[in-house]
From Swiss-Prot:
The keyword Phosphoprotein does not apply. The keyword Cytoplasm applies. One of its GO terms (molecular function) is ribosomal small subunit binding. GO terms for cellular component: cytosol. This is Ribosome-binding factor A. One of its GO terms (biological process) is maturation of SSU-rRNA. The lineage of its organism: Bacteria, Pseudomonadati, Pseudomonadota, Alphaproteobacteria, Sphingomonadales. Signal peptide: none annotated. Monomer. Binds 30S ribosomal subunits, but not 50S ribosomal subunits or 70S ribosomes. InterPro entries: KH_dom-like_a/b, RbfA, RbfA_dom_sf. SUPFAM superfamilies: Ribosome-binding factor A, RbfA. It is found in: Cytoplasm. It comes from the Bacteria. One of several proteins that assist in the late maturation steps of the functional core of the 30S ribosomal subunit. Associates with free 30S ribosomal subunits (but not with 30S subunits that are part of 70S ribosomes or polysomes). Required for efficient processing of 16S rRNA. May interact with the 5'-terminal helix region of 16S rRNA.
Amino acid sequence: MRRNETPEGRSVRLLRVGEQVRHALSDILMRGEVHDDVLASHMVSVTEVRMSPDLRHATVFVKPLLGGDEDIVIKALRTNTAFLQSEVARRVNTKYAAKLKFLADESFDEGSHIDRLLRDPSIARDLDQDAD
């Protein structure tokens, strides 16, 4: 493992720039700087940003809060991608402006599915037997 890599294999620089992009996007969306009716009426959480190794592409994972419709929010974000890219480029100092790709964050759904499975009485019983 290289000195500047995390155990997952991503460099610290990629993680740092990804966090800067995430904070910039969160700030833009929270302040309502995007003039879009859908984005104005939905609270959107930017959960993660994964940068490509050359920092030219950013995959942005978002989750609408309060049960908002993911498809409508993703479509609105994709419609406003050019504005968001220019704002992020202005706030995050990198050589190139990253192209943003918006995807729905499925990790919360996967986590709740695993939680439901672990609460299933038959599985809980098996887990208790294994612990003994």
